[in-house]
From Swiss-Prot:
Highest taxon of source: Eukaryota
Name listed for the protein in its UniProt record: Pectinesterase/pectinesterase inhibitor 18
One Pfam family matching this protein: Pectinesterase
Known catalytic reactions: [(1->4)-alpha-D-galacturonosyl methyl ester](n) + n H2O = [(1->4)-alpha-D-galacturonosyl](n) + n methanol + n H(+); Endohydrolysis of the N-glycosidic bond at one specific adenosine on the 28S rRNA
Length: 557
């Protein structure tokens, strides 16, 4: 760690450089406001669409209505009382991209000039988060271009804009422990980006057609966004899948590569077709970061107890939570089957992630994911887990994706001294995000080391990591290691009235809801239509992308 009194720019000319940056930024902001206001005037004078709302109407559902209206006022003039919402969103996103690029430069300079491993790691996280956020905003503008919108388009944009806000918040979390001088230069710009991401979501939600806000389409066994080929792959016999793999990884030299990292590096970038890496039985001590350009990559092993990818990065030893993952997937369309993802850092090392997924339309099938605190980081976007075995202690399924778990074993372990087990810590930051954790037809049990001492160790279904945390447990078996209260607060009254925690049609000795918490945000779901909002079909639009993968899934209840 660098000294907290160490200035970011240590040379005498640094103050001039800093002041010059601030002046240039101010001038550029003024210029951008004028430019984008002019663009908006042009758009509105040529468009008499009936999708017009005042700024107060657009901001009605915003996290902070005053902030929303203040930011939108940059794009209005006294002669304009109404705005075309889609045009406004497009212009607003263009402006946000410009501001993001400016902030990226500042963050990059802060990383270069910072001292200490933790500082550099935090800023590196931010650079990555802003880079992918730019991509998501550009994709959103392209998706809505031309006026040919459908439910898939709306679902895509809602998911992508939700991820942008989460990325910015992840960035702020990663730099929370960096030196004060380094942080104070970039934090105001990052907080401005957060505000703009919230406004973009508010504008978009005001555009949404009348429909369920968690519209998802999944049928049969997998989400519908899986292609026919992907579905065939997941339904293929292990032998067939291994024979047809593009490359083989084997520690004994019988494959093309000896490490998974080598195989990932050799995989094509931005591939439109599935690229399969077969990883033979063995223990692979590697930290693997699958970049955003490694799209449609699939890792296949010899079984969730045979092919093991293991690491031990953790927060106590200097990593950020984001960077501690043994395997991190950032390329859209990521799939994994018959693999064991492991982080062996142990409970004393605090946050230590086994698998982090920041990739859209991800499928994890028949895998094992083992660690203690923060085992599985379902960071952003749409994810589906089937027939997998997940273990941990504190907040061991966490993040802010739209994620469904089906037919999984969710197993609490014996934690460190004085710790309580929390199965989930969902991180929804804004009421307009379409994110949630849905656990359907799973088994929630205690591990062999926890079962004998479960009377002395408190285990809960989850706690609210963020203000609008949203988690549903439905049609699952809940064993008696779960505390009768069911859920646990994060910090006092925080989020207890704004969260959404639901339980529906569960079984087992721990499923009794008579002694559950009486928070405003908790409810025992009685109506199947309400529960359906958290199915594969509605939460992750599974019907659009899971079918082609071949993975088994249940579309509805």
């Amino acid at each position: 760690m660098s000294n907290s009194n160490q200035p970011l720019l240590s040379k005498p000319k640094s103050l001039k450089h800093k002041n010059l940056c601030l002046v240039l930024s101010f001038v550029a902001i003024l210029g951008s406001v004028a430019f984008f206001t002019a663009q908006l005037i042009s758009v509105n004078t040529n468009n008499n669409d009936d999708s017009l709302l005042t700024t107060s109407q657009i901001c009605h559902g915003a996290h902070d209505q005053d902030s929303c209206q203040a930011l939108l006022s940059e794009f209005t003039t006294l002669s304009l009382s109404k705005l075309n919402r889609l045009d406004l969103l497009h212009v607003f996103l263009k402006n946000s991209v410009w501001r993001l690029e400016s902030t990226m430069t500042m963050v990059s300079e802060a990383r270069i000039r910072s001292n200490g491993v933790r500082d550099k790691a935090g800023f590196a996280d931010c650079e990555e988060m802003m880079d992918v956020s730019k991509d998501r905003m550009m994709s959103s503008m392209e998706e809505l271009r031309g006026g040919n919108y459908n439910l898939e388009s709306y679902s895509n944009v809602h998911t992508w804009l939700s991820s942008v806000l989460t990325n910015y918040m992840t960035c702020l979390e990663s730099i929370s422990d960096v030196s004060v001088n380094s942080k104070q230069i970039v934090k105001p710009q990052l907080e401005d980006l957060v505000s703009r991401a919230r406004v973009a979501l508010a504008i978009f939600v005001s555009v949404l057609p009348a429909r369920d806000d968690l519209k998802m389409i999944i049928s049969n066994r997998f989400p519908s966004w899986l292609t026919a080929l992907d579905r065939k792959l997941l339904e293929s016999s292990p032998k067939t899948l291994k024979v047809t793999a593009n490359v083989v990884v084997a520690k004994d030299g019988t494959g093309k590569f000896k490490t998974v990292n080598e195989a990932v590096a050799a995989a094509p970038e931005n591939s439109n077709t599935r690229y399969v890496i077969y990883v033979k039985k063995g223990v692979y001590k590697e930290t693997i970061d699958i970049g955003k350009k490694k799209k449609n990559l699939m890792l296949v092993g010899d079984g969730k107890d045979a092919t093991i990818i293991t690491g031990s990065l953790n927060v106590i030893d200097g990593s950020t939570t984001f960077r501690s993952a043994t395997v991190a997937a950032n390329g859209d369309g990521f799939m994994a089957q018959d693999i064991w993802f492991q982080n062996t850092a142990g409970p004393a090392k605090h946050q230590a992630v086994a698998l982090r997924v920041s990739a859209d339309q991800t499928v994890i099938n028949r895998c094992r994911i083992d660690a203690y605190q923060d085992t599985l980081y379902t960071h952003t976007l749409r994810q589906f887990y089937r027939d997998s075995y997940i273990t941990g202690t504190v907040d061991f399924i966490f993040g802010n994706s739209a994620v469904v778990f089906q037919n999984c074993d969710i197993v609490a372990r014996n934690p460190g001294a004085g710790q309580k087990n929390m199965l989930t810590a969902q991180g929804r930051e804004d009421q307009n995000q379409n994110t949630a954790i849905s656990i359907q037809k799973c088994k929630i049990t205690a591990s062999s080391d926890l079962a004998p001492v479960k009377g002395s160790v408190k285990t809960f279904l989850g706690r609210p990591w963020k203000l609008y945390s949203r988690t549903v447990i439905m049609q699952s078996f809940i064993d008696n290691h779960i505390d009768p209260a069911g859920w646990f607060p994060w910090d006092g009254e925080f989020a207890l009235s704004t969260l959404y925690y639901g339980e529906y049609a569960n079984t087992g000795p721990g499923a009794d809801t008579s002694k559950r918490v009486n928070w405003k945000g908790f409810k025992v779901i009685k109506d199947s239509k309400e529960a359906e909002q958290f199915t594969v079909a509605k939460l992750i639009q599974g019907g659009l992308w899971l079918k082609p993968t071949g993975v088994t899934f249940q579309e509805w209840l």
